[in-house]
């Protein structure tokens, strides 16, 4: 090894420097001087990372965020992960290195284990405030977040149908996001209150990858069977 140092010594030295905040390492990218990363504040840029941009409530959500940021002299940096963990991690690395004053983020596949917690720890280290919306990783329950009452919503819509005299109620829930898990809880609660047995054949779980095909296919199958 150059300079006559063993690899073990080099790794130990880098570990000490990283622990003291002098350097920052990114998997697949390399090791960088932390002085560069400390220049991230004062940019006036607030990053908004969502799973989708044009679907569901996101257009209005993003519009509202942008209006508030603009009124307060900030600029928005918009990123769309497509609910991909890999994209989320890549965007976080990019945003940290380029410089942001804050982050609003909807986590990707929030019900699954987050394997890039270290990137959020980097945000904490450099005192970059961030807040989760729409979902929250299980490992980060203590972090600032704004969530809808998905369990309550699942309960209310199911209860409405039951109160209307319906008994054969199917439920479609997303398995890899927190919202789907919580809505399922509400669905189950409403059935239990009306003393209706839970039927797993009436529950369809789908994932990000098959969200555009599986629900429609299962609806057609259910209609044919009835």
Which residues does each PLM region occupy?
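Bacterial carbohydrate/catabolite-sensing allosteric modules
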Residues: 20, 67-75, 90-101, 114-226
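Residue-level marker for beta-strand->alpha-helix junctions and adjacent short loops that shape enzyme
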Residues: 30, 53, 110-111, 137, ...
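N-terminal helix-turn-helix DNA-binding module of bacterial transcription factors
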Residues: 1-41
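Amphipathic helical "hinge" segments at domain boundaries
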Residues: 37-102, 109, 188, 192-193
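A short, flexible N-terminal coil/short beta segment enriched in small residues
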Residues: 28, 40-49, 163, 168, ...
């Amino acid at each position: 090894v150059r300079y006559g140092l063993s690899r073990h010594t080099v790794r130990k030295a880098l570990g000490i420097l990283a622990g003291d905040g002098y350097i920052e390492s990114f998997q697949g990218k390399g090791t960088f001087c932390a002085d560069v990363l400390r220049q991230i504040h004062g940019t006036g840029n607030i990053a908004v990372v969502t799973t989708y941009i044009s679907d569901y409530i996101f257009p209005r959500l993003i519009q509202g965020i942008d209006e508030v940021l603009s009124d307060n002299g900030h600029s928005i940096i918009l990123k769309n992960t497509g609910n991909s963990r890999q994209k989320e991690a890549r965007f976080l690395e990019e945003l940290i290195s380029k410089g942001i004053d804050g982050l609003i983020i909807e986590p990707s596949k929030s019900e699954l284990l987050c394997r890039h917690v270290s990137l959020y720890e980097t945000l904490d280290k450099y005192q970059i405030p961030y807040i989760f919306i729409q979902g929250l990783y299980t490992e980060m329950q203590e972090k600032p977040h704004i969530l809808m009452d998905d369990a309550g919503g699942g309960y209310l819509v199911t209860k409405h149908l039951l109160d209307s005299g319906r008994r054969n109620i199917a439920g479609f829930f997303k398995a890899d996001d927190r919202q789907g898990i919580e809505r399922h809880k509400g669905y189950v609660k409403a059935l239990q209150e009306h003393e209706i047995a839970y039927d797993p054949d009436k529950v369809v779980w789908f994932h990000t990858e098959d969200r555009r095909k599986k629900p429609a296919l299962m609806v057609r199958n259910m209609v044919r069977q009835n």
